[in-house]
Amino acid sequence: MEKKSCMILALDVSDREEALKIAEDVSEFVDAIKVGYPLILATGLGIIRELAEFAPIIADFKVADIPNTNRLICEHVFEAGTDAVIVQGFTGRDSLDACIEIASEYGKDVFVVSEMSHPGGAEFLQPVGEAIARMAAEAGAFGLVAPATRPERVTTIRKIIGNKLTIISPGVGAQGGKASDVIAAGADWVIVGRAIYKAESPREAARKIAAEIEAEFEQEN
């Protein structure tokens, strides 16, 4: 995944035409599009190849099962044309290894959730988030998912993994996270959903957030 804008669109809409229109409108400002259950359950896996005309696709299925089932899920995900899959780490090393094994066969990537961005994410996942981050690095995952709503946790995770893994960070916009803060904290990409796809002009909303990120990099340099 090439880093240009450092922004990923979380396209959690349920209508095919709306999804394609938004993807086309904001493609200039995003490095990837993250799709999840709302869109896939409503439209089918076929939407992935259509969206891939505009940007690389990350399947946010938070895969969390036994190794054999994880392999089957990941096979279907990559056969559908996705470039990466998001999986849970709390299921353990063997389940994670199964996902990474299939991703390697397809030449694709795996992102592991260390912590989720909503308030409840601090209840059970945060206490084991650092252990999950270490496991993901040891297993050879491509990256981690860490919360933009808690930039200090992104900083902590970055210190643990160094530059071994990339960090993508959800929660910018509607959940209260600020793009510039989480980039400064150590994230490689921010994930933005409702602040873009629910905006009156998704393109303009994406442009403004991209400009905010660019300004943060200019300030750092």
Swiss-Prot record:
Q: Which GO terms describe its molecular function?
A: orotidine-5'-phosphate decarboxylase activity
List, alphabetically, the Gene3D superfamilies matched.
Aldolase class I
Enzyme category, top tier = lyase
EC? 4.1.1.23
GO biological process assignments: 'de novo' pyrimidine nucleobase biosynthetic process; 'de novo' UMP biosynthetic process
Pathway assigned in UniProt: Pyrimidine metabolism; UMP biosynthesis via de novo pathway; UMP from orotate: step 2/2
- Kindly give the Pfam families that the UniProt entry links to this protein: OMPdecase
Q: From which domain of life does this come? A: Archaea
List the InterPro entries.
Aldolase_TIM, OMPdecase, OMPdecase_arc, OMPdecase_AS, OMPdeCOase_dom, RibuloseP-bd_barrel
CC annotations in GO: cytosol
Name the residues annotated as catalytic in the UniProt entry.
Answer: 62 (proton donor)
Coiled coil located at which positions? none
Annotated substrate binding lies at: 12, 34, 60-69, 117, 170-180, 193-194
Q: Which SMART domains match?
A: OMPdecase
The reply on keyword NADP is no
Which UniProt keywords are given for this protein, alphabetically ordered?
Decarboxylase, Lyase, Pyrimidine biosynthesis
Q: Which reaction does this chain catalyze?
A: orotidine 5'-phosphate + H(+) = UMP + CO2
PANTHER family documented for this protein: OROTIDINE 5'-PHOSPHATE DECARBOXYLASE
Protein family (similarity comment): Belongs to the OMP decarboxylase family. Type 1 subfamily.
Q: How does it assemble?
A: Homodimer.
State the protein's purpose: Catalyzes the decarboxylation of orotidine 5'-monophosphate (OMP) to uridine 5'-monophosphate (UMP).
What is the name attached to this protein's record? Orotidine 5'-phosphate decarboxylase
